[in-house]
């Protein structure tokens, strides 16, 4: 921390995970939880799925399986209403604003986030400084023809309890988050290879680095 205060670092790379949203990170004692649950902790989504009105699933991770989504997307949309499309219920935490402060001071080279909640964007970060490795709920597109849609389409769908379909080809509209079975965006790998050798400080926040490709 002294190095930050003394402006010794000017090329900082950050790897961020769910802990900066749900309150598991302790960096600078800055965390005030946004209210969004994480996935794998003792209090996370996968171990507490019975709290949500989701049909029984043998494996909770199938909610985020690309091929299962195309066959039966109802569990995802039920959960998405509770977690992501909440009419502005969730807000950035001080950790998110800490990252934005680094950016404002010209010290931040890149943030690689595992989060899909879009709170980094709400705090003021944006591409190309922000790399959303697992995608974002802030955008959406048709799974079939890739037509992009207004990001409010999923919010309208969950409010009306409907599944959104593409007006062009009839395919399902899906938030632009990376499901199991999908590739990460190319920009993630390009920036990792470029940024890491040139960084003078790496900060890991809110992640155990156990999820591919962060480990």
List each model region and its residues.
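Conserved catalytic core of sirtuin-type NAD+-dependent deacylases
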Residues: 1-215
């Amino acid at each position: 921390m002294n190095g930050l205060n003394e402006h010794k670092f000017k090329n900082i790379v950050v790897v961020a995970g769910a802990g900066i949203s749900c309150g598991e990170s302790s960096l600078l004692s800055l965390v005030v939880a946004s209210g969004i649950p994480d996935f794998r902790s003792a209090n996370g989504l996968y171990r507490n799925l019975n709290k949500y009105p989701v049909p029984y699933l043998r494996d909770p991770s199938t909610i985020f399986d690309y091929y299962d989504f195309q066959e039966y997307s109802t569990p995802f949309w039920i959960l998405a209403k509770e977690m992501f499309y909440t009419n502005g219920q969730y807000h950035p935490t001080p950790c998110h604003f800490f990252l934005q402060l680094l950016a404002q001071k010209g010290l931040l080279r890149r943030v690689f986030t595992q989060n899909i909640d879009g709170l980094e964007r709400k705090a003021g970060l944006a591409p190309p400084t922000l790399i959303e490795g697992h995608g974002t709920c802030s955008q959406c597109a048709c799974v079939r023809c890739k037509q992009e849609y207004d990001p409010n389409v999923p919010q309208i769908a969950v409010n009306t309890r409907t599944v959104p379909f593409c007006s062009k080809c009839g395919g399902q509209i899906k938030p632009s988050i990376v499901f199991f079975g999908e590739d990460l965006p190319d920009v993630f790998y390009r920036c990792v290879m470029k940024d890491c050798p040139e960084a003078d400080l790496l900060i890991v926040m809110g992640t155990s680095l156990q999820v591919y490709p962060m480990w």
